[in-house]
Amino acid sequence: MDDDIAALVVDNGSGMCKAGFAGDDAPRAVFPSIVGRPRHQGVMVGMGQKDSYVGDEAQSKRGILTLKYPIEHGIVTNWDDMEKIWHHTFYNELRVAPEEHPVLLTEAPLNPKANREKMTQIMFETFNTPAMYVAIQAVLSLYASGRTTGIVMDSGDGVTHTVPIYEGYALPHAILRLDLAGRDLTDYLMKILTERGYSFTTTAEREIVRDIKEKLCYVALDFEQEMATAASSSSLEKSYELPDGQVITIGNERFRCPEALFQPSFLGMESCGIHETTFNSIMKCDVDIRKDLYANTVLSGGTTMYPGIADRMQKEITALAPSTMKIKIIAPPERKYSVWIGGSILASLSTFQQMWISKQEYDESGPSIVHRKCF
């Protein structure tokens, strides 16, 4: 498809917004889902200071801004800021006129009905898009892996979901949500590094810790054994240079941080770990399809990028499932963007073209059309 008529695919995550053109194999723009407002009154008259900044610009000026995330736990909670993010996506990142392109948006599983309607309304009334569609994130990840049946464990920055999908349809009664994801792990790493005597407190310093997490953390296959190894030798230690030149060393924190995915009690949470949540989700499904779900367990989202996570999931789910069950964990290398990639695939299918909600249909039926056309 040509860029001039190609559909736009926008995956709005709690942490990052991924946007680009249908038919591409990767998003053109990936930027933080952040809106920042100045903390102090501007002193330089005529500097043309803005009253708000979005994405990378907000990130780079974080020292003088108060940063807000309009998407919490995968669900939009601040529509004015969300509109700013979409505006930034179309006009500054993709440099397109939204009134000339169909737009595919993604939503969290179990997104409230009112939210889908609000998204639809903003697209048609604020941005005047000719057509739009809202797709469930986990379903897109499954498409991106070349499947229509399986269970997706999608874990991003703000929320983790386990979503069983059969023949392309998500099974809502069996979807489970876990409010434990990347941001919680970053906060936990901040806490355990503080115990080491390093101080990280501000929102700006949190971004440094996020970088440490992404570069150095991994999931242990056997947590107790790894703890013993870390205690008896320095083989697991790695160093990291902070922006000010100070070098810090991190040891067992490297695997203690993501261990919280399997043992949420580390964060003082009573919920089940991601392995049990996946198992519970499968058990809520019809007995006849469980075999297909066990054999097609797909990992998706940035928080599944830790080295070692697939092997650990395999081990934990094997321990929970019936002993004869074949279990396969699929961890595609591009899983950080698999929701977006699935959207790109879907929006460029010829069979999908009749699925779009057109401006005409919206004008006739109003925002509730989204429940009839997008499922």
Swiss-Prot record:
In-chain residues carrying the UniProt-annotated modification N-acetylmethionine: M1
Alphabetized Pfam families for the sequence: Actin
Signal peptide segment: none
Residues annotated with N-acetylaspartate modification: D2
Post-translational modification: ISGylated.
Substitution effect: D81A: Decreased interaction with SETD3
Modified residue annotations for Tele-methylhistidine: H73
Record's miscellaneous remark: In vertebrates 3 main groups of actin isoforms, alpha, beta and gamma have been identified. The alpha actins are found in muscle tissues and are a major constituent of the contractile apparatus. The beta and gamma actins coexist in most cell types as components of the cytoskeleton and as mediators of internal cell motility.
Matching PANTHER family: ACTIN
Protein name, entry field: Actin, cytoplasmic 1
Naturally occurring in which organism (per UniProt): Homo sapiens
Source organism phylogeny: Eukaryota, Metazoa, Chordata, Craniata, Vertebrata
